[in-house]
């Protein structure tokens, strides 16, 4: 395992750990999810350069599109929850009332 791949895997692991630890605020959870999406994007960008594979070049763009959609939905949810409840605490939400 090269040092770059190790660092990217470590960044993904820390983002996953942050998602599991900081679940009280929605904003910190969304930031950790963005870190989790950034790590596969960087890995998918570096891999075709090392393997000289032309078929893998569109994959980072697809990952980036999914990350942008996830960020847009997350920010829309954050704005709606902040306007409705006045804060972004996750424990104030009752998902069974939908």
UniProtKB/Swiss-Prot annotation:
GO terms for molecular function: NADH dehydrogenase (ubiquinone) activity. It is an enzyme of class 7 (translocase). The chain crosses the membrane at residues 2-22, 26-46, 59-79. GO terms for biological process: ATP synthesis coupled electron transport. Its main location: mitochondrion. It catalyses: a ubiquinone + NADH + 5 H(+)(in) = a ubiquinol + NAD(+) + 4 H(+)(out). It is found in: Mitochondrion inner membrane. InterPro entries: NADH_UbQ_OxRdtase_chain4L/K (IPR001133), NUOK/Mnh_C1-like (IPR039428). Its EC number is 7.1.1.2. Pfam families: Oxidored_q2. It comes from the Eukaryota. The keyword Ubl conjugation does not apply. GO terms for cellular component: mitochondrial inner membrane; respiratory chain complex I. It is a multi-pass membrane protein. Keywords: Electron transport, Membrane, Mitochondrion, Mitochondrion inner membrane, NAD, Respiratory chain, Translocase, Transmembrane, Transmembrane helix, Transport, Ubiquinone. PANTHER family: NADH-UBIQUINONE OXIDOREDUCTASE CHAIN 4L, NADH-UBIQUINONE OXIDOREDUCTASE SUBUNIT ND4L. Core subunit of respiratory chain NADH dehydrogenase (Complex I) which is composed of 45 different subunits. Belongs to the complex I subunit 4L family. Core subunit of the mitochondrial membrane respiratory chain NADH dehydrogenase (Complex I) which catalyzes electron transfer from NADH through the respiratory chain, using ubiquinone as an electron acceptor. Part of the enzyme membrane arm which is embedded in the lipid bilayer and involved in proton translocation. This is NADH-ubiquinone oxidoreductase chain 4L. The gene is MT-ND4L.
